[in-house]
Amino acid sequence: LGDVYKRQRYVHNDICFPAQIVIGEALAALESGKYDPDKVAIATGKYIGDCRLTHYAALLRKALDDAGYPQVPIITNDAEDAHNVHPGFKMNLKTAMQIAFGLPMIDALEELLRKIRPYELEPGSADAAFDKSIDAVIGGLRQGGIGGMKKGFKKAIASMLSVKYDRSKPRPTVLIVGEYLLNFHPGANRDMELYLENNGLEIIEARMTDVIRKTYFYQRSQQREYKVHRPLPTKLNNSISDAFFKLAHDATDKIAKAHPLYTPPCRMPELVQASDPIIHHTFDAGEGVLIPAEILHHAKRGCRAFVILQPFGCLPNHVVGRGISKRLKELYPDAQILPLDFDPDVSFANIENRLQMLIMNARKPRTS
């Protein structure tokens, strides 16, 4: 979090915590001296239009200009650039297809890592195999595009198969969901995953693929069910993108099933429609229905501990995170649902106290 504190002179401290993290880290990288500002670009995620995530590129542009890096371009994952703040790059179909194929593969490897690491017989072997696996997928992509990535993924699964483990005494499981930067950024969430694992739990994480795919799925559902008008090119793009994610899932499942611990994920249509009793599957604010959908999906499979990570003051995720807790408790009275708010000044002692209550309850023998 030092990057955030040191660079708050370029980002107002009332802006979203994820924005402070992203912009702070970008500036820290430039100030480190490792990169030539005249030969580097910064990539940042950007999607949906109901929260300040839409404005991260503009906030980053202002911070870079104020910090003395006006020449550094910004790359985002969409084609919108109304103010010409990041010229020189437009994501093409080939790049989008490679991303669509890569995400399910990374999700599969991370799932295997979380199922193996708490039970590994040789400390550090799971992390080492995972790092080797990621290198294999990236190397395959560089050498042979999507075909090369598939070959690299086969090598990755072989690496994960080489790790020895003993799952004869399974741990209680805990699902981590919430705003996706907090979910996947250990610096932002204070190494939440490692902390819970070190305290005797097995971690289940939401999938990054669903975070990206949901935009295309929602828009198609809104077009069909509510007759929302969108231009024909947008409709075609949504249909093609959603179909390509399905192909990517199919290819990933076909290769990953070689590992006995791999479980094919619940696909987007089935996953989100299961949340209809709480939030309709076409609702797309914040993380949309992914938070209740993931919780319901894993609750049906025996998980009873859930942590929802939220940036402080993030209204969309308060609605679909903390706001759904009461209804979920009605459906699963024995479930623990712990919403946690994060900002740069949050006390880890406060977070730890609340986590310890969840950990102690999760580790209690469950009564039938």
Model-derived regions: residue spans:
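An N-terminal assembly and electron-transfer interface module characteristic of large anaerobic redox
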Residues: 2-368
